[in-house]
Amino acid sequence: MPSPRILIHGGASVAFWRTAPTDIRTAALRGLAAASAAGAAVLRAGGPALDAVCAAVMVLEDDPLFNAGTGGVRTSAGTLELDAALMCGATSRCAAICGVNRLLNPIDGCRRMLDAGKPAFMWGPHAEQRCLGLGAVSRRDDGPVPLESHAAGTVGALALDAAGRLAAATSTGGLAGKMPGRIGDSPVIGAGTWADQGCAVSCTGDGELFIRAAVAHHVALSTSPLAAAAAQHLGRVATLGGMGGLVAMRADGSLTAAVTGGDIARAWWTADGVSGAGLLAGDPWPT
């Protein structure tokens, strides 16, 4: 059985990472490494993949550099509408929320919903009420954030634990300046997030097109080598006129990060002692 491992992404962008000042890129790499380390700590202790992906994503949600949780971008009306999803590969249990603004860590809300059972997908104040009632922590709204303050995207994490179980988590503030009420692919199981017994996937990019192409599910179902499957289905997004990226991991331990039309922030760790992080094409990639 392959050793435990974690793979995360901090969003795909056409130009943000390559044009960002050095201090921003350094901070981003530091944040990615911290998220990877948080997930790795869970796996080292023998914890489940679900706990590992939630721990990793919560670090990114707490980092204002990334477009999730604390760093979530605003709609065209200046409101905050956060989305997140979580899926357990071993059981096919999942939970997703969208359009929330009162949760400090939306992915923690998803975990509490997943553990509680039905419903699996909730929106807005009803999702908030459900998650807060299950013990999720509320956030303080510090007021409007300039729409141009972030250009990077969604965050996500995948993990394989010592028992061979996979999990996937995705969290986002969505598209900067989006129409209020708009929901992208991140909380849509099978489009932006997926995990089964064989594969886990988390996506980032032009959400409407990832929904149309059901990217996460198609990558998971593919019998092609993982990198080829990722390239094929990101190619479908490109054919539809969009850009984006994804991270994917199989139960055999193979993993990949891929992007079309830009760059994707990524980091990874395996119990075999392999780890790394990167933002640009010339930076390290997981293999």
Language-model region placement:
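Alpha/propeptide regions of enzymes that mature by internal proteolysis
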Residues: 1-287
